[in-house]
Amino acid sequence: MKHCATQTLESERLILRRYQAEDYKAMYKNWASDPQVTKYLMWPTHPNEEVSKSVTEDWVANYSNEKYYNWAIVLKELGDEPIGNIAVVDMNELAESVHIGYCLGRSFWHKGIMSEALQTVIDFMFTVVEANRIESRHDPRNPHSGGVMKKCGMQYEGTLRSADWNNQGICDACYYSILRNEVQYE
């Protein structure tokens, strides 16, 4: 893969950009403090802004790594305030494969925002980084996340039983993927 670190990406309604130190307040307010958002995630709900600040500081420090891809999701009409997160959370260099994770503030659910963000990252990972495979997974009790993956052309590969863990405990994991040769770019 041709790594180039987290680049600013733009779609019709969104800017996907690097986190900045001051983004912790928006992170806490818009998604990290909401137990409904974190219900099926692998990290706990943030009890205070200090936790969000520490996480944001770690993310900002990692931007010097060319293999680090982590974006703040910004809705253009709202200015520069992050409303969610999308990132490469795992990578297999030999298979040229990346695993994408994402979350979005609850007030922005069911508006096509996460599908737009995921499609933007898929396009970047295939055309710039030249990944061969992009995958993601979700808890079957969170079918809307699978809907995001399907909307972006990802194919359901199967459900691994009791193979994952999230804030609900041990859970099944529904896997989806898309391959570079399944997408046509001009």
Predicted regions and their residues:
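Conserved GNAT-fold acetyl-CoA-binding loop/helix
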Residues: 38-58
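Short, conserved alpha-helical segments within structured domains
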Residues: 44-48, 69, 141
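Hydrophobic residues in alpha-helical segments
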Residues: 31, 41, 63-64
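Juxtamembrane helix-loop transition sites at the ends of transmembrane segments
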Residues: 50, 57-60, 174, 179
